[in-house]
């Protein structure tokens, strides 16, 4: 099974010492994402702890 990588990451500053990473998709990538099996679909937004923020 090949890993499917689509889109690009945009970093968005958040409050409460967090940074938000948003996966930005082009229209073609959105179609590819929608056609992935459910267990292979990506999480589009992830909040992580960022010690320098």
Curated annotation (Swiss-Prot):
It comes from the Eukaryota. On the 2D-gel the determined pI of this unknown protein is: 6.2, its MW is: 25 kDa. This is Unknown protein from 2D-PAGE of needles.
């Amino acid at each position: 099974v090949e890993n499917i990588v689509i889109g690009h990451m945009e970093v968005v500053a958040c409050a409460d010492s967090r940074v938000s990473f948003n996966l930005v998709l082009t229209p073609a990538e959105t179609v590819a994402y929608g056609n992935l099996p459910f267990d292979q679909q990506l999480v589009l937004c992830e909040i992580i702890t960022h010690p320098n923020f």
